[in-house]
Amino acid sequence: MKFSYWGAGILAVALTVTLGSNTLFASQPLTAATEYMQKNDSDSIKVENLAKELKKLKPISSDDFKSKFKKEISGFKLTEATAFEDKETGSYATANYAKGSKNVYLMVTDGAGAGAEQVKGNLLSYLELKAVEEPGDKTNIKNYKGWSVYFDHSMYENDKMTSIQYLEGNRYSVVASGTNIPLDELKSLLDNISL
């Protein structure tokens, strides 16, 4: 497609006027949008650098992975722990903790070696969600253990389900799902986990 000099000039003026006022539809000054983009870019670079370092590491063995789960955390007792090794996707493990009617299920992926791509993908998706997050959403992206991570209340109040997806120890991608446990109590339990 060829543009005439007039067409290119009109397009340049239109872009300058649009970007010079407020960003389209957001009613934010260009400086605020630019600052957010720069922060998001620096967060993305941080994620990329982490993934490069994780790829260099050797994945944890299944026996060592299972042994990382404490028998009891904040009154929750470990009822089950399993771990697996896969050359294509890396090592991963699951654990279940229970206390009365409260239940916390953990799915953990070792970010070392092949698992680095999953860790990278998760962290980048949290950054993307943060960009569209609105007040009142049941899903919130918060800073937790040094990274932007996913905090989620259930869509339905009566099912009492919560979820936190985060990065533990700059290596392990954790999905923690709770039943009959409020989000703040789930976070408190996760504060006491160290892999």
What is each of the regions a protein language model found here?
Residues 1-10:
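Bacterial N-terminal signal peptides that target proteins for export
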Residues 3, 24-25, 124:
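Short, aromatic- and cysteine-enriched interfacial helices/patches
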Residues 16-24:
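C-terminal segment of classical bacterial N-terminal signal peptides
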Residues 25-62:
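Long, hydrophobic/aromatic N-terminal blocks
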Residues 29-43, 131-195:
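A short, solvent-exposed beta-edge/loop patch
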Residues 49-160:
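Short, solvent-exposed recognition patches
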